């Protein structure tokens, strides 16, 4: 019978995963607002910030952000290869603005 109760270590790990996933989404919104990115570029950019994630994690996040209207996906033929570029939408820019306000508020409170 599988243990129904999580250990503190499991709970901690799950909570950290949820935090990092939120941070990753913010990074994606920010960077795609600067210029169009394709998946591999975003993965490399996130790695510069210390996030190690698989394509199996990245692409579902990108697809969800597109489905919710925060990103736009555009296919381009680059040297005979189809690449999907992601760009921040107006709705995504509005959300990012709200997130930035909340981040500033949180940092001001926590770091005071």
Residue map of PLM features:
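N-terminal helix-turn-helix DNA-binding core of bacterial DNA-binding proteins
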Residues: 15-57
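Basic amphipathic alpha-helical segments that dock to polyanions
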Residues: 58-60, 64-65
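Short, Lys/Arg-enriched N-terminal segment that forms or immediately precedes the first helix
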Residues: 2-17
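Basic, amphipathic "hinge/linker" alpha-helix immediately C-terminal to the N-terminal HTH DNA-binding motif
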Residues: 82-99
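Short, aromatic/basic-enriched loop-to-helix "N-cap" motif that marks the start
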Residues: 55, 81-82
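Amphipathic alpha-helical dimerization/coiled-coil segments
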Residues: 94-112
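Extended, well-structured beta-strand/loop surface patches
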Residues: 8-11, 66-71
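Beta-hairpin "wing" of winged helix-turn-helix
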Residues: 68-81, 87
């Amino acid at each position: 019978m599988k243990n129904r109760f999580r250990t503190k270590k499991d709970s901690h790990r799950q909570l950290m995963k949820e935090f990092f996933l939120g941070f990753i989404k913010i990074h994606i919104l920010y960077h795609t607002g600067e210029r169009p990115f394709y998946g591999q570029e975003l993965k490399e950019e996130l790695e510069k910030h210390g996030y190690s994630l698989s394509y199996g994690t990245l692409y579902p996040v990108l697809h969800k952000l597109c489905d919710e209207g925060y990103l736009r996906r555009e296919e381009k033929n680059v040297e005979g290869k189809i690449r999907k570029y992601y760009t921040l939408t107006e709705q995504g820019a509005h959300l990012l603005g709200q997130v930035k306000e909340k981040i500033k508020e949180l940092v001001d409170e926590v770091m005071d």
